[in-house]
Amino acid sequence: MPCPSQSSDELEFFVNGKKVTEKNVDPEVTLLAFLRKNLRLTGTKYACGTGSCGACTVMVSQHDPVCKKTRHFSVMACLVPLCSLHGAAVTTVEGVGSIKTRLHPVQERLAKSHGTQCGFCSPGMVMSMYALLRNHPQPSEEQLLEALGGNLCRCTGYRPILESGRTFCMESDGCLQKGTGQCCLDQKEGDSSGSKSDICTELFVKDEFQPLDPTQELIFPPELLRMAENPEKQTLTFYGERITWIAPGTLQELLVLKAKYPEAPLISGNTALGPAMKSQGHFYPVLLSPARIPDLRMVTKTSGGLTIGACCSLAQVKDVLAESISELPEEKTQTYRALLKHLRSLAGQQIRNMASLGGHVISRHYYSDLNPILSVGNATLNLLSEEGLRQIPLNGHFLAGLANEDLKPEEILGSVYIPHSQKREFVSAFRQAQCHQNALPDVNAGMRVLFKEGTDIIEELSIAYGGVGPTTVSAHRSCQQLLGRRWNALLLDEACRLLLDEVSLPGSAVGGKVEFRRTLIVSFFFKFYLEVLQELKADKRLLPESTDSQRYPEIADGSRSSLGDFQVTLPQGVQTYQRVNSHQPLQDPVGRPIMHLSGLKHATGEAVFCDDIPRVDKELFMALVTSTRAHARIISIDSSEVLDLPGVVDVITAEDIPGNNGEEDDKLLAVDKVLCVGQVVCAVVAETDVQAKRATKKIKITYEDLKPVLFTIEDAIQHNSFLCPEKKLEQGNMEEAFENVDQIVEGKVHVGGQEHFYMETQRVLVIPKTEDKELDMYVSTQDPAHVQKTVSSALNIPLSRITCHVKRVGGGFGGKVGRPAVFGAIAAVGAVKTGRPIRLVLDREDDMLITGGRHPLFAKYKVGFMNSGRIKALDIECYINGGCTLDDSELVTEFLVLKLENAYKIRNLRLRGRACMTNLPSNTAFRGFGFPQGALVTESCITAVAAKCGLPPEKIREKNMYKTVDKTIYKQAFNPEPLIRCWNECLDKSSFAIRRTRVDEFNKKSYWRKRGIAVVPMKFSVGFAATSYHQAAALVHIYTDGSVLVAHGGNELGQGIHTKMLQVASRELKIPMSYLHTSETCTAAVPNTIATAASVGADVNGRAVQNACQILLKRLEPVIKKNPEGTWRDWIEAAFEQRISLSATGYNRGYKAFMDWEKGEGDPFPYYVYGAACSEVEIDCLTGAHKKMRTDIVMDACCSLNPAIDVGQIEGAFIQGMGLYTTEDVHYSPEGVLYSRSPDKYKIPTVTDVPEQFNVSLLPSSQTPLTIYSSKGLGESGMFLGSSVFFAIADAVAAARRQRDIAEDFTVKSPATPERVRMACADRFTDMIPRDDPKTFKPWSIPIA
């Protein structure tokens, strides 16, 4: 390789209009790292590091001297090598606009449309929309969806983000609700006691937004324009510590370099090479960049086809194909249309902007979406070397890497030739993935057939599959055997048999889902068969007039439904809430849809998160070393090699902890043995994060494996491995009740786990002070007091010496209640030992590997009922997978059992729960805290009863629902009147009865597509079961200028607690919110705080803020009486002069929770949140894909403190719950290694998963006396309502099974992934696939529930 002692060339580019010149660029440095560390532009966030989430989105502008145009495109900064930006202009969120200078309309609209919650994803959302608007100032709705397809948000549910983007779009023709022909604004208001004049449907005022003026954007720097038009042809070389980057200026130079460094890969978009080098250990000392060579970006159109340069991005390829389709006759564009179809859903927009056609082809990934189509479309690869041009077909031989049909080490791919399709030729593409967009396919396919002229006899047939082998697999042998056959039903049967014989998938195949993937092989061909049959029937031009029309049989109406894919459209919806009383003063913000206080800062990137804090003097970085064994004794930890590495300062082990090493069963750092893969064993401290992370790979740990090793709930039950005693509630006489019923049904329910996937990973900054062993800690946590206590215990220092600061948290969902204390303590030990500040920021993979998530559940039920549907007895036994330590598993078990009954009064009821101990990372608190799993069990019982009775599930729900004031199974009294109102309004607003009939009519006519509709009720108990957690304090200071600082014990997680607290203070002090400010949550200002969790943050802290403000106002009363015409500032100045204290501590001694498990009774919860949701879906029975057509939610919020924030909480929780029940599948290896630990392997919902029609109504005229201003906490309750989508899918599956005469007493496990839906819709294709004996192979993954 080149000598690194040589001097590097200068790298020149622009950032936000300012020139940047770097003389010593390390090729391993990414744009994201440079922006954050070197330029201190921290608005661009690190969230995944693999280009899969969009948090690091920026815009890159480059001038193309060939077409004389400047391109603006969004990219993922975490993947962009800094070296690749020579001559480019980068725009970050700071360059778009700021609060300090001028807001850009994108930023303003995102914030004011309530499109930010935690705000961590917001800069990325802004940049994706901004890049779109730079290219299309008035985009279409389809373009908006495409632009945001690569951006993830875990908080909002996307609807308000899309709503903000819609304000820039071309006006549509209206918003007719799908299937009703009515405008969403014409919804019925239901049977509410509030009049229509009291109901509002506007959360923001569109007319107040500043207009978009495209002429005011940053221009492309003239200096870069000159560089592009008159490029320096010499080779640029950048030498790093380990890698050399060479960017030649001409094609010939590149070919010479490739001959000199034949093993050096070409790096273009870095979308494949980057993740491989980061996560898979690949390393290349020399990288060759073809970015400066225009020859490799050329596009040539000829009469026979398209030649596209290998360095063209996939986005450019997409544009070229779309242009050709618009210019050419349809018969010539079959292959182009198939490619374009996959390009719309392949990855996200940013990756399509970065990834090159050549890289996509050459990588030959088994999941490649384009190679199967290029292969069947007879594409040709133009290979270049010093020896000249060599052409090879992109066929099965190339894809298999056969010697004579592959690239030689000294060759590069110059371009790809894609011929036009021809008359009598049909080309189609198919793919099925966990989500519609930004998800790798489970299986994809390209298929092409050419018929002999005037016949349906096959002349050529090509079929290629992705996702069924190590690379794209060509079914060449099957195709050859089908030549000369007619396109009819006999061919279909023979083709399926041949394909299954040739395209074999072993039972242990990587990725699992083997039977599903086998089924897709033939399901896709059936779709292709029908598509071609339809075209043959419809297109008379293909056949001479004398051809017998009976040759092409009519496609049955039911089969016609399998044609085409689900179309994704921008969601529509309406949000309704009750207006504030007309007599309420205008300055009183309570009940109004106030924007999140940090909304504008979120949108401009000026909101400071934990890792955005500037590096402090002498700061070190920490990286964790985790166990690679599930259950083993630690024989030794050898760090000798590590301590000699550059930059490494120390290795922290359990021996370095001066105090307590955590709990007995939950150590901070492992001692003697490990209990799971991912347990933290030790930590490396180094000068930089890169040095620390590299050093962790050199720690040598010797293990001795121990038995037993338990992963599944079934394993734990067999070994009697439990974390705590059984929790049980029972009422009535179970035995007698079961003896006196008409029918009994028994069943099982499985609910998978769920990753928190907060956008901001776990992170902490610890700064030791010079005196008295004091520590300042900046932590991303929901419970700073717990961090403080854990650090105090570990270091043996008083709590008063440790100050924890929480400015804001980039999402928590329960995942930042307990775990941050562990990371904080480990970092604090390192800080004390080294005497230097320590920063610990977990990579996404480590975060997901270590921290655990929602408890997977397995339940058995037995239900006895009358033929009328009245349930007389119900016995449920639940087991949750707690992982290797107790954590919150006992509490989750208690809440699970307490909440299992949901909305139903069942006189004879037995509920039991156990937490299993397994060798997996400990599962922990998660939004809903057991209710989303438990309530799904109960609703599954309801569905089973309905099926047996032959009655609609909603009738069974109504018959068994609480109706009047009653007591729960644990003897707590409550009034279900709001529950009944929510249920009735949901049925009414959703037009359920009408749509139920329409769904049934649709299903009668459609065989391969089925619709389902379901409505579920909810009774969600709010609060902690421990009395000590129902307390809070606040500290309010009034300064002499009249400004007010409010401190309280709640933590801002995105749920808007700071906004709500200032609304409370504004009302109590009778001053505008502009006078009020809150800075952070700090244990020095408000001590002994409780976790911000259980939906009571605003309840308990609101009362404390209210109390403090009332104390202050009481003190000011004499001053105000003396000068009633004075201003607020006058009164404050007078009070100061009179030595009246302008500081007050407020305190709330809240609800006295009580639960006696021995007696099975108590009052554990202060109140309930009631709600109901109705969802309608359509499923594709051949692939398992589904489309969410409409969701209506009615929620009892009582008197909402802030309708905009509360609606956002409901929508966000619903979408997160929908993810739990449909897409978020957790996979572990048979050795206990978590596979799904990055966003490309673990799929949370995206913008394309939002229901097409998404309506939310807050129940009007509802009251509760227990909370601040009669409001309710809504942070968690919407989670379970996502199950309405699950039960709608199950309803659609049931319809399919009925039509196929298959038993309806089936169970779809949660999540209802495409795999599970497809396999539940059993048919001729699922019947024909081969099935393996489970004893003959080792599965890729294991079911932990």
Curated annotation (Swiss-Prot):
PANTHER family referenced in this protein's UniProt entry, alphabetically: XANTHINE DEHYDROGENASE
Binding, [2Fe-2S] cluster 1: C48, C53, C56, C78
Family membership: Belongs to the xanthine dehydrogenase family.
Subcellular localization: Cytoplasm
Subunit text: Homodimer.
Location of the FAD-binding PCMH-type domain: 238-423
Residues that coordinate or bind Mo-molybdopterin: Q117, C155, G812, F813, A1094, S1095, V1096, G1097, Q1209, L1274
Gene: Aox2
Gene3D superfamilies cross-referenced by the UniProt entry: 3.10.20.30, 3.30.465.10, [2Fe-2S]-binding domain, Aldehyde oxidase/xanthine dehydrogenase, a/b hammerhead, Aldehyde oxidase/xanthine dehydrogenase, molybdopterin binding domain, CO dehydrogenase flavoprotein, C-terminal domain, Uridine Diphospho-n-acetylenolpyruvylglucosamine Reductase, domain 2
Catalytic function, reaction form: an aldehyde + O2 + H2O = a carboxylate + H2O2 + H(+)
Binding site for [2Fe-2S] cluster 2: C118, C121, C153, C155
Organism: Rattus norvegicus (Rat)
Cofactors that this protein relies on: [2Fe-2S] cluster; FAD; Mo-molybdopterin
Protein name: Aldehyde oxidase 2
GO biological process, one term: xenobiotic metabolic process
Function description: Oxidase with broad substrate specificity, oxidizing aromatic azaheterocycles, such as phthalazine, as well as aldehydes, such as benzaldehyde and retinal.
Note on cofactor: Binds 2 [2Fe-2S] clusters per subunit.
The 2Fe-2S ferredoxin-type domain, residue ranges: 9-96
Active site: residue positions: E1276 (proton acceptor)
CC annotations in GO: cytosol
Domain of life, source organism: Eukaryota
